[in-house]
Amino acid sequence: MKYGFWLPIFGGWLRNVEDEQMPPTFDYAKQVIQSAEKWGFDTTLIAELYLNDIKGPEQDSLEAWSTAAALAAVTEKIEIMTAVRPGFHNPAVTAKMAANIDHISNGRFTLNVVSAWWEEEARQYGGIFTEHDERYERTLEFLDVLKGLWTQETFSYDGKFYQIREAKLAPKPVQKPNPVLYAGGESERGKQVISAACDAYVMHGGTVEEIERKINDMKQRRQATGQAPFAAFGMAAYVICRATDEEAQEELARITDVKESSGYAGYQDFINKSQLETQIQLRDYSVSNRGLRPNLVGTPEHIAKTILAYEKAGIDLLLLQFSPQLEEMERFAKEVMPLVESLREASHSLS
């Protein structure tokens, strides 16, 4: 199991808690990622939104790609997975930027490809936001251009959305043939595009049974393309680790006390502009990315056993959220991660 975390670029993950003591500043982000390296985390995921989806559109947030480049220069081991939304980017310029950050990081830069869901944000920032399936058609062409520029000495492309004429990109990325392309999606068209064009599949939080079904489905879809298996299956989850179940449940009740909040500004766009497999309740939206559904809430032993259940279902990358970030990441690294290893070893010795 690889342990990843979402970089706190929005000032937290809780829509019902105003101040989580984790400011959306570069200094705090740098402190978090450098500490995470010391504690044994493998990956960080930097979301790309120009408006703050957690605390409200009027609140501060960090821009993803400039933050990724800066953090690449002050870290040594951790994978820096950064979201990219084709409706906001020129693919040739994106290919160049990604190759550059891959060199800054010495091969640690990866992409999370997102076809976008927030129409109001696109309106404010001049992004291209068309009907659902067309967004995925654009994504497919976008990925064609990235891969072509990363792998061919001279590249031309004549598509519906993008035209490239004898373009050269040098230097190529450190990673061959390309930086890993992660993506998540639940619609039929989304799963088709991801199976055909991406390297790894990431999911919002879900129960073990939900996640196992999704993994099996995507494995079959990938096999049907004739390509190598997906490099990873990842899942988002929010962690509440406490000494007792009672303490953990008290914290859960506190953060899911739904209030009127500007942090819910994107809720209707998220459920209406996406094609979701799971019905989302307002309580689920209290925490980002359906993070409560995996139920990593309780004692270290409960959380460790639950992680092993997801590992058995096929998850090999967790993308975790914590609040407050530094304190809870350290607790997880010291109390949960070693316990997962010892429980796994004990299970193997019994078998």
Where are these regions (language model features)?
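An alpha-helical appendage that flanks or caps ligand/catalytic pockets
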Residues: L7-I9, K38, Y125, H132-V174, ...
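Acidic (Asp/Glu)-rich catalytic clusters
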Residues: E37-K38, A68-E76, A98, D102-F109, ...
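Active-site mouth loops of central-metabolism enzymes
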Residues: W13-F26, A83-A92, I128, Q175-E186, ...
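N-terminal beta1-alpha1-beta2 module of alpha/beta enzyme domains
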Residues: M1-V74, D158, V174-P179
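Conserved, mostly hydrophobic/aromatic
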Residues: Y3, A36, G40, L71, ...
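Short, acidic/polar
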Residues: P23-A36, T94-M97, G184-V193, L296-Y310
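Alpha-helix-loop-beta-strand connector modules within alpha/beta enzyme cores
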Residues: K55-M81, R138-F142, K334-S347
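Hydrophobic faces of well-ordered beta-strands that scaffold small-molecule active sites
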Residues: Y3-F5, T44-I46, E79-V84, F109-V113, ...
